[in-house]
Amino acid sequence: MTDQPIKTMTGAEALVSTLADHGVTACFANPGTSEMHLVTALDHEPRIKSTLCLFEGVATGAADGHARVTGVPAMTLLHLGAGYLNGGANIHNARRAWTPMVNVIGDHAVPHQRFDAPLASDVVGMAGPNSRWIKSADTVAQAGELAAQAWEASFGPEPGPVSLILPADTAWLEGGKPGATRARPSLRAPDPARIDAAAAAVKSASKPVIIINGTALTEAGLAQAARVKAAGIRVLTDTFFPRQARGAGRFVPDRMQYFAEGAMADLEGSDLMLIAGTQVPVAFFAYPGKPSVLVPEGCTPMMIGGPDTDSAAILAALADALGTKEAAPVAELDVPGAPTGALNAAAIGASIARHMPEGCFVSDDGVSNGLPSFLMTQRARPHDWMMLTGGAIGQGMPLALGASLAAPDRKTLCITGDGAGMYTNQALWSMAREGANVVNVVFVNHSYRILNIELARTGAGNPGPAAQELLGLGHPEIDWVKLSEAQGVPAANATTAEEFDAALERAFAADGPRLIAAHVPAR
């Protein structure tokens, strides 16, 4: 009897196995020729579920949504630099959400790179600006170890997307082995000196506020925020946050206003601004004669902890330092009645508050029409709201796809504008293929309405015919029902409040994805 030879791992197998060893359970992929051995490695790794996405922006947005639900990174599989660039907008959004994500980017075999083949590019130069960490596994011995490093780096010091480049020959050569197991890095604990300084500043302030994000927006974190509110500190969230626990039984913080002048007016008179789990607030854009830093005159900003800190623990420590025994009230369930008449953003918000089931995840890419839905669901059944953090529209459907696959037993609602939805409508195909429990609500106004608003705010003048063509989505109008059904997702039009309310009730009751094209006024 002869001994059977021991099969060694390929570089691709070492990479995939290492990520699985570290708890990665999802891969959102749009592979090409250079990634074929990674595809095979995924086929042999039952711990990771692979989902095909027809556009890289869907893959990266879905990985973001998956991680926002699970708290651990998902893997993306992207085809060289061009594939990375296609997914770049939603990687940018994930970076702004501090979302851990491991982007595996295939590349040409190392000996082939010097020939400048048509798909050759500077992958490091392209991926570097949006990556917290980036390395290339140029030898098979590096593949597993760099995969472990990538996973670890996605958690910090500041969480976010990382990029691991895998040349084709590294993927196919044997001699790989899994990387050494890493422990998950923790967010930084509160700094006692900063807590004491903040408590002292609060006691001498007349109108203190605190801006929060991160773990402070979990259910447990909001319970601590309610204690801070009871101590006399106004609590506000960032304008856009990765995820917030909301609805009945949860404390309702205020939210920073979007427009600079509105935010400054809202904060007028504040003399102390504490920061926990985020950064000093700044305006989304510069406008003539408007401030960029949203701190009122006479107000002192004080950083207690940035995005790399456990902001829920900061709030608890601050409340303790202030001797707070009470807590501010939480939201009570208040479901509105059925809306009637014309269909508009307020009617849609009322229907969402009526029918959204407990435990629902909401992916908000609603742009100009999203605010009423946010406000009207404050006292709805308990749910989690996920927002567009980086301003690159087209995140809504991919984020919802990833969230749904991370929590298939919970419903996910996507609200998106028709302009935003067209960036990544291919997510519908993946939803249909996976049977994702996503209800998509598309605000159809045949316009980039937010840009019409911004045109006036920037002082760019009155739009003429050419400007109107650049800001409108008519000629031809997009038929969202046909677009959705062509990708396997049942859909319906709604033109009145009654039609929308009935369609939404049916959509939440159904299994699998649904889409409602909600026809709302352009202005």
Where are the regions a protein language model picked out?
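Phosphate/pyrophosphate-binding active-site segments
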Residues: 2-6, 141, 165, 177, ...
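N-terminal alpha/beta PP-like core and its mobile active-site loop of ThDP/TPP-dependent enzymes
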Residues: 2-325, 439-440
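Active-site diphosphate/adenylate-binding microenvironment
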Residues: 12-25, 30-33, 38-45, 329-409
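A general structural motif
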Residues: 55-56, 115-117, 185-197, 216, ...
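Short, glycine-/Ser/Thr-/acidic-enriched flexible segments
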Residues: 83, 109, 169-171, 215-217, ...
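Thiamine diphosphate
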Residues: 104, 112-119, 371-523
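Generic enzyme active-site microenvironment
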Residues: 236, 363, 415-416
